[in-house]
């Protein structure tokens, strides 16, 4: 009887741990907003700003349902000022502002020109 009780407790603990880990992993993957980006070679800051804006409007907002919901639209107004881009030729940090019908959102975009990746994080 005691053995059966111990096995049940261990089993329930294992299930609880598994659920916790699965929720954590799904939250991390949802917040991890990294994807491939075009090569930065021979692009000016203005061209990179235009590519970031295009990437957000064509690729990101269509897949980020929570952001669309918060903004109140699937067609927000997006702007990037090339003069606000910081960093060197390898890593560029780009402030991105998005305006919807419900609210505005600001993102920090990092373009890794060596890895050809783009990552988004929301500024709160």
From Swiss-Prot:
Transmembrane segments: none annotated. InterPro entries: Uncharacterised_YebF, YebF/Cmi_sf, YebF/ColM_immunity. Its main location: secreted. GO terms for cellular component: extracellular region. The keyword Methyltransferase does not apply. Belongs to the YebF family. It is found in: Secreted. HAMAP family: YebF. This is Protein YebF. NCBIfam families: PRK13680.1, YebF_not_Cmi. Keywords: Disulfide bond, Secreted, Signal. Gene3D superfamilies: YebF/Colicin-M immunity protein (3.10.450.300). The gene is yebF. Residues 36-123 form the YebF/Cmi domain. The keyword Signal applies. Residues 1-27 form the signal peptide. It comes from Photorhabdus laumondii subsp. laumondii (strain DSM 15139 / CIP 105565 / TT01) (Photorhabdus luminescens subsp. laumondii). It comes from the Bacteria. Disulfide bonds join 40-113.
């Amino acid at each position: 009887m005691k053995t059966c009780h111990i096995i049940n407790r261990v089993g329930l603990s294992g299930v609880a741990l598994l659920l916790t880990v699965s929720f954590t992993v799904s939250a991390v993957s949802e917040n991890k907003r990294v994807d491939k980006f075009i090569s930065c070679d021979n692009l000016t800051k203005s061209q990179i700003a235009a590519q970031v804006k295009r990437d957000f409007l064509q690729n990101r907002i269509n897949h980020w349902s929570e952001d669309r919901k918060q903004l109140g639209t699937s067609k927000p107004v997006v702007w990037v000022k090339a003069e606000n881009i910081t960093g060197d030729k390898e890593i560029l940090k780009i402030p991105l502002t998005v305006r919807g019908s419900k609210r505005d959102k600001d993102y920090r975009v990092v373009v890794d020109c060596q890895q050809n990746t783009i990552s988004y994080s929301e500024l709160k």
